[in-house]
């Protein structure tokens, strides 16, 4: 089941995060950047339950292909011509319980400072990771980090690129990589991997030469309010001894306002029904107990960072109806949103309780 969701995630990310961004620059071929990096790091012991695994120093390699935006779409100039890229990443964890991992991710690489010879960038990406070695109750029960072979990955990185020649650049970087299946399969403490990087970039064009285009006017919807109605579904495993995957669904009503070219602010109400909580409650309650309602309702505020049809989503919510106290009183959400049309959108979101993944939400909605 996780594999099916994983390939759906890969399709959406590769189709919207890479090709969708690139499609807007199709009239003029934008220059490419090819990179090869060596990486080294350590596993962060973010909970006592994984300290026995945070003893090695993983090493890895990355190959990536980036397209330098050049002004063919209005948002290129708004973000000072970022790069969009596809990366293939390999890690050897030097620990037999963890083995190796292979990942593919799409990302945006935003420059904060750029001269003819130097760049200082922030990179943010997401994708899929594959772990041949995972938790097995009989043979690998100490691997509490990785419960499934297929996992989502999130990557954040600071990079410094300095020119060695007209086309060749030396790259130094600091990164944080996260691997998790979003509680679809337990155990799922996930891997947090701080890294240092050293590598080379081949720039097809340096320095950047944006297209000579006229300044674009403000989008017509800046300052306008909108209403979003959406529903989401997800599946999660309760624990490693219960192999059933339980349905989690939600409905959301949100209001928002586009405050500038780059940002939407949103606030909403939503209701949740997590069927794994019913099973959990029945396991712990006495037969004579009156069971509380496992449904929850919450209110949230959030931000959407806009890249054409694509947006990075972040929410912070509070439960105001929570009879069964199975988690903290607040929740967070990180995700990717894509507008298929002006009205119809889809999301892939990770809902989190206090840093621990709760569920991956697959959302479909309507903007009014």
Segments from the language model and where they lie:
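Bacterial Sec-dependent N-terminal signal peptides
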Residues: 1-35, 120, 168, 194, ...
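Membrane-embedded beta-strand positions of outer-membrane beta-barrel proteins
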Residues: 34-38, 84-86, 122-126, 156-158, ...
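Extracellular loop and loop/strand-boundary signature of outer-membrane beta-barrel proteins
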Residues: 48-51, 91-94, 140-146, 182-188, ...
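Solvent-exposed loop/turn segments connecting transmembrane beta-strands
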Residues: 55-56, 92-101, 116, 239-246, ...
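Outer-membrane beta-barrel architecture
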Residues: 62-66, 107-109, 157-159, 199-201, ...
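Outer-membrane beta-barrel "beta-signal"
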Residues: 63-65, 192-213, 357-368
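Repeated loop/turn-to-beta-strand initiation elements of outer-membrane beta-barrel proteins
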Residues: 72-75, 116-120, 162, 166-170, ...
């Amino acid at each position: 089941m996780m594999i099916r969701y994983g390939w759906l995630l890969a399709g959406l990310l590769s189709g919207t995060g890479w090709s969708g961004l690139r499609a807007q620059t199709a009239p003029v071929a934008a220059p490419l950047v090819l990179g090869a990096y060596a990486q080294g790091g350590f596993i962060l012991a973010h909970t006592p339950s994984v300290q026995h695994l945070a003893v090695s120093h993983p090493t890895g390699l990355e190959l990536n292909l980036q397209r330098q935006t050049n002004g063919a779409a209005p948002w290129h100039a708004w973000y000072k011509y970022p790069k969009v890229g596809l990366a293939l990443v390999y890690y050897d964890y030097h620990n037999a319980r963890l083995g190796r991992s292979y990942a593919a991710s799409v990302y945006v690489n935003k420059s904060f400072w750029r001269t003819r010879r130097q760049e200082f960038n922030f990179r943010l990406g997401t994708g899929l990771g594959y772990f041949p070695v995972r938790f097995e109750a009989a043979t690998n029960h100490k691997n509490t980090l990785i419960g499934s072979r297929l996992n989502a990955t999130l990557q954040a990185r600071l990079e410094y690129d300095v020119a060695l020649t007209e086309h060749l650049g030396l790259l130094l970087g600091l990164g944080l990589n996260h691997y998790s299946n979003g509680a679809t399969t337990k155990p799922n403490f996930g891997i947090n991997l701080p890294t240092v990087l050293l590598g080379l970039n081949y720039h097809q064009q340096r320095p950047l030469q944006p297209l000579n285009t006229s300044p674009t006017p403000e989008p017509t919807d800046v300052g306008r309010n909108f209403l979003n109605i959406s529903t989401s579904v997800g599946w999660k495993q309760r624990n490693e001894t219960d192999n059933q995957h339980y349905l989690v669904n939600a409905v959301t009503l949100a209001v928002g306002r586009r405050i500038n070219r780059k940002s939407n602010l949103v606030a909403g109400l939503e209701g949740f029904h997590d069927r794994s909580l019913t099973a959990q409650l029945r396991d712990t309650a006495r037969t004579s107990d009156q069971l509380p309602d496992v449904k929850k309702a919450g209110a949230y505020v959030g931000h959407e960072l806009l890249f054409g049809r694509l947006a990075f989503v972040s929410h912070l919510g509070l439960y105001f109806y929570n009879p069964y106290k199975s988690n903290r009183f607040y929740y967070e959400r990180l995700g990717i949103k894509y507008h298929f049309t002006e009205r119809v959108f889809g999301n892939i979101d990770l809902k989190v309780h206090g840093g621990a993944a709760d569920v991956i939400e697959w959302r479909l909605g309507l903007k009014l």
